[in-house]
Every structure is written in structure tokens, then in C-alpha cells.
């Protein structure tokens, strides 16, 4: 009821929200299920490990199933998600829904990473950015080497408490029916003695990992640009479609150490130098400065940045919408 009924096509810019956490409200005000031709953007993946808000759950909702009868197109931000989405649509008899891929745009007129910036940086960091669909423990396990001058860092961001340890985190261990509680204080955990040596070594290992990472709660936009212009980024992705952090690194020529997820390969290509298969390989690669410089050079010279501009996105999307409207 909040759209012009004379329009040929209804557009939903966040289908996931409409049919998941916004479903109750939109159903109450009779916006959904859609019963007219519509299209929209899908942002989440099929991963079920992080939240109940995922595409597996969305396809289970009756409102979405009914709405699919009237859907003419869905838009996603990766070929990886497009293939999964098309397969699911086919499985439920909705092959009439076209799925289009667009590249997520970002600001491209930004401060760039340079070798000089990195070398002159007196507080070099490898920064894990964000927590959504990331293994946020991996940065704690990454082994930089005893002589490394690169500080492991987490840029936490807002509403990310659930993905990183809180500063008042505590661990309870029950041994021989006796429960002992410890906080993550490096000093405390390395001075304590436990009867069970397994737990003794385990808690000390966790304490060392915990203290090996500096957590930055948040930064301003300008501070973020500066960080990415002279440091390295680290990601261990559980799943992905559009990865804003990767795109932000690409337009800045910033080296990023990342696992070789299909959606990332679409952005960085198959031969990017700082992919890793496991944390042992990640730890080995980051200790070699040549790998860092090769990754920077690759991003700076081998990737066409035009497709990340807002203009390119707008033109591509407008052409698709025009063709859809012309065909209905």
C-alpha cells in the first residue's frame, strides 16, 4: 500500500529484511506477501552458522514463497550466490525468477596504500575488520613470528560484541567436580597453577592468544582511510557474497591476507598472492614482506577498479531494470 500502484514493477532493496526480521511488521501492514510483479536485492547467504537470518530460513517462510510467484528478478552481489540461489529456485519450481549479479560499489576517490606508507609506519598492523561471516578467532591464532614488528589488531566496529571477547571475559573450568573461574588476564593466567596440567597449558595458551591482539572499538571514516593506507588487512571468511572489506582494500591497493573463498576469487582473481588455505599457510605468507608487496602490486596493476564505482553500478542496474520493465 506504500507504493504507487500505477508502477509496472515494485522494487525491494533489502529482500532479506522484508521477509525475515521485518516480516512481522510488513505482514501486519499488509505489504507482504507481494501479489504484484516485483524484484529486489538479496544480501545474505545460505550459511546457517551465524544467524537464523539466512536464505535457508527465508525460503521456509510462507510469505516469501507466495511472493516468489510474482517475482520477476532477484539481484545478488556475487556469481557464487547467484548459482546457489538459482539452484534453490529451480528446486522449488520458481525457475521463472531471473537472478542478476552486480558488483557492490564503493567510494573510489580515497587515500591509497603505498610501500612508503607501510615502511614508514611505526605501528604496522595486520587488522581483522568486522565479525559478520568471519572466523573472528583466527586472528588470535595467526602466528606472526617472534621477530615480527606487525601488531595483530581487531577493528571491531559497532554491534560486534558477539564476535569478539569482552574485556571482562571469564572462563569456568570444572575438574574433579570443582569449578574454578578465571578471567583472561595474562598476568593472572600465567601465574596460576592448576592441578590438571592439560587445563594448565590450555588456559595459558588462550591467555597468550588473547593478549596477542589489540582491539580497536571503532574509528572515524578518516581514521579508517588512514589505517587502510599503511597497514595490512586479514580476513578468515566462513561464507561471503559481497565482501565490503575486500572491495575497500581493492580500491585502496591495500594488501589483504584472506582465505580463497569463491566470492573473493571473483573480486581478486585466481592468482592473487595472499590467499591462504589454512592458518599455517597464512602465518608463513605474512612473515615474508615480498608476499605483501606482490599482493599490493597485483591489486594496483591487475584489477580494473571501474566496476567498483557508483556510476558503473548505477548504469548497469538501470539497464537491467529498463530491460525487465520492457519485457513485462
Which role fits each region the language model picked out?
Residues 117-156:
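Conserved donor-binding/catalytic core segment of Leloir-type glycosyltransferases
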Residues 255-258:
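Short hydrophobic beta-strand element within catalytic cores of glycosyltransferases
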Residues 280, 290-328:
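A charged, aromatic-enriched C-terminal amphipathic alpha-helix characteristic of glycosyltransferases
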Residues 55-74, 201-206:
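Membrane-proximal helix-turn-helix segments that form the acceptor-binding/catalytic region
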Residues 70-87, 91-113:
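Donor nucleotide-sugar binding/catalytic pocket of nucleotide-sugar-dependent glycosyltransferases
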Residues 9-11, 28-52, 102:
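Active-site proximal beta-strand in glycosyltransferases
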Amino acid at each position: 500500500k506504500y507504493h504507487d500502484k500505477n508502477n509496472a514493477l515494485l522494487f525491494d532493496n533489502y529482500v532479506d529484511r522484508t521477509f525475515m526480521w521485518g516480516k512481522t511488521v510488513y505482514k501486519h501492514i499488509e505489504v507482504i506477501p507481494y501479489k504484484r510483479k516485483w524484484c529486489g536485492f538479496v544480501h545474505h547467504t545460505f550459511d546457517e552458522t551465524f544467524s537464523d537470518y539466512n536464505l535457508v530460513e527465508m525460503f521456509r517462510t510462507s510469505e516469501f514463497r507466495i511472493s516468489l510467484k510474482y517475482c520477476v528478478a532477484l539481484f545478488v552481489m556475487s556469481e557464487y550466490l547467484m548459482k546457489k540461489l538459482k539452484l534453490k529456485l529451480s528446486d522449488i519450481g520458481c525457475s521463472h525468477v531471473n537472478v542478476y549479479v552486480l558488483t557492490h560499489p564503493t567510494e573510489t576517490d580515497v587515500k591509497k596504500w603505498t610501500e612508503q606508507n607501510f615502511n614508514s609506519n611505526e605501528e604496522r598492523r595486520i587488522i581483522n575488520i568486522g565479525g559478520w561471516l568471519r572466523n573472528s578467532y583466527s586472528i588470535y591464532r595467526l602466528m606472526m613470528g617472534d621477530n615480527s614488528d606487525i601488531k595483530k589488531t581487531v577493528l571491531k566496529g559497532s554491534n560486534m560484541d558477539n564476535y569478539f571477547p569482552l574485556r571482562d571475559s571469564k572462563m569456568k573450568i570444572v575438574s574433579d567436580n570443582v569449578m574454578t573461574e578465571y578471567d583472561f588476564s595474562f598476568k593472572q593466567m600465567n601465574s596460576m597453577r592448576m592441578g590438571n596440567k592439560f587445563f594448565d597449558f590450555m588456559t595459558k595458551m588462550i591467555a597468550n592468544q588473547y593478549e596477542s591482539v589489540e582491539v580497536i572499538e571503532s574509528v572515524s571514516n578518516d581514521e579508517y582511510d588512514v589505517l587502510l593506507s599503511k597497514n595490512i588487512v586479514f580476513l578468515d571468511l566462513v561464507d561471503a557474497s559481497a565482501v565490503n572489506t575486500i572491495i575497500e582494500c581493492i580500491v585502496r591497493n591495500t594488501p589483504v591476507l584472506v582465505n580463497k573463498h569463491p566470492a573473493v576469487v571473483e573480486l581478486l582473481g585466481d592468482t592473487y598472492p595472499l590467499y591462504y588455505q589454512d592458518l599455517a599457510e597464512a602465518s608463513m605468507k605474512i612473515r615474508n614482506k615480498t608476499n605483501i608487496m606482490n599482493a599490493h602490486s597485483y591489486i594496483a596493476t591487475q584489477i580494473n577498479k571501474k566496476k567498483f564505482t557508483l556510476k558503473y553500478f548505477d548504469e548497469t542496474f538501470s539497464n537491467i531494470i529498463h530491460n525487465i520493465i520492457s519485457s513485462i
